[in-house]
């Protein structure tokens, strides 16, 4: 079985804060904007589309400065998509340009907030994604999430 190609955005603003969004389908579950890439899209095209869809942010509102990945996780049984075993994610760190408005009132997220990376809690992430988030925080911020 294959892994579904996926991209995720870690958006930063001056002061070192990052944007996290609470999922609409799971209360108290926070994550970065992310989504699957279509076969005919580059990772950057997929990132721009997903960010626009999920937080209404146009590409000219941020600048990608770093990326790491891919990171893999396996879907829980019954949650497989498109015949895939799991997801293979590339994470992109981007800086806000100016003070863009973040809009999250949609099917993906119910709200958003800016936090310092060291205040992120692994319990906010569904168990299946926790190893990926631990690796992401280690790679981007040199933070070990317990």
Give the label of every model feature segment.
Residues 26-28:
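A conserved beta-turn-beta hairpin within the catalytic core of GNAT-like acetyltransferases
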Residues 12-16, 83-85, 143-144:
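Short acidic/polar alpha-helix capping motifs at helix-coil junctions
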Residues 23:
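Short loop/turn segments immediately following the C-termini of beta-strands
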Residues 31-34:
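A short gly/proline-enriched turn/hairpin at secondary-structure junctions
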Residues 37-128:
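Unchanged
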